[in-house]
Amino acid sequence: MKDVIVVIGPWLIGQAIAATVDASSREAVHGLLDTATGLGQVTGLIHAAGVSPSQASPSTILNVDLYGTALVLEEFGNVIASGGSGVVIASQSGHRLPPLTAEQNKALATTPADDLLNLPFLQPDQVTDPLHAYQIAKRGNSLRVMAEAVRWGRRGARINTISPGIVITPLAKDELSGPRGEGYRRMIDSSPVGRAGTPDEVGSVGALLMGPDGGFLTGSDILMDGGVTAAYWYGDVPEIQ
C-alpha cells in the first residue's frame, strides 16, 4: 500500500517535499527517514497511512495499519529530536474490540516490528474478517504508542495517538458506501453529538498534541468520536456485524 507522505524542513515555510512511500516496507520507510534527516533534525512526525475494512483484506490491513505503524515508529523513534513530538492516527474502532489478554496487549506493544505479524493470534486462521483485522490494528497502534512513549521520552520527545470516529474523508466515504454503511450511519445518528466529524476538528487536536500546550501529554490516546463509543457500549447503538 503506497501513501504520499510529506516531509517539511524547518526552514521551508510554505514548501514541502512529497514522497510516495510503501508504509509496510522497511526499505521504503528508511528511505523516507534518510530524506527527512537530510533536511535537518526531525522534530515532528504525523503518521496517518492506513487502509480501511472496505478497502483491503485482513492481511493487507495488518501489514499496513499494524506492521507499517510499528515500522514508522521504530525508524523515526531512532532519530526524533529532543523536544520533538509525534501523532499516530488510530481509530475509534480499536475501542470496540473486546478486551485482549495482558499477554496479547504486551505483545502488540513491544514485539519488534519485524516479528509482529508472526504472533499466533494474528495468523490468517485467527483473523479472517477485515473489520476484526482493523480493530486489532488500531488497538495495536494505541498500545504501541504507549510503549514507544517510554523510548521517545529518553530522547526528550513525545508521541500520542488520536482515535477519530467517522470523519468526512475519502476513506470514510468508502466505508459509508460499503457493506457496513448503514450501520455506520446508525452509529452517527445515535451518538450524543449526532454528526460526523471534520478533518479540521482532528487537526485541532493534532495541533495540541504536536505543540507546546500538549507538553504534558505522551503515551496517550485521544478518543474523539462524538460519543459514538460511549453510545456503542452504554447506549442503544446496535453492534455492527
Specify the residue positions occupied by each region the protein language model found.
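Canonical Rossmann dinucleotide-binding motif of NAD(H)/NADP(H)-dependent dehydrogenases/reductases
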Residues: 1-15
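A conserved structural motif in NAD(P)-dependent oxidoreductases
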Residues: 191-202, 213
